[in-house]
Amino acid sequence: MSYKEGDVLVTNGEQSPGYKIVEIKGLVVGITVRSRGLGKNIIASLRSLLGGEIKEYVELAEQARLQALQRMVDNAKALGANAVVNVRFDSNELSEAMDEIIAYGTAVVVEKSS
């Protein structure tokens, strides 16, 4: 899967069709730490009694992933890259109410293939 985040190509593959890697800049990481918050925890706890999707946590997870991804892209730009390949996400629970979300990949310079 490939897409553009601003002017930076982002893909979970080793390369993106139609592009060739001309320079490897190195590892880039984007991190965010999010608190679930008391209000959302109460609502989510009530929803969990009924079963099904807990929308408050889904929304929080989506926002955290996007922020980690944007920080990774910003770090790639700072290195002079115009693409990030092999993008992955990871997460860790830091405490009962806080999670760390990490986006990481390899910053590269790509050119369109001829």
Swiss-Prot record:
Q: Where is the signal peptide?
A: none
- What SUPFAM superfamilies is this protein classified in? YbjQ-like (SSF117782)
* Gene3D superfamilies noted in UniProt: Hypothetical protein apc22750. Chain B
Family, as annotated: Belongs to the UPF0145 family.
Q: What is this protein called?
A: UPF0145 protein SSO1976
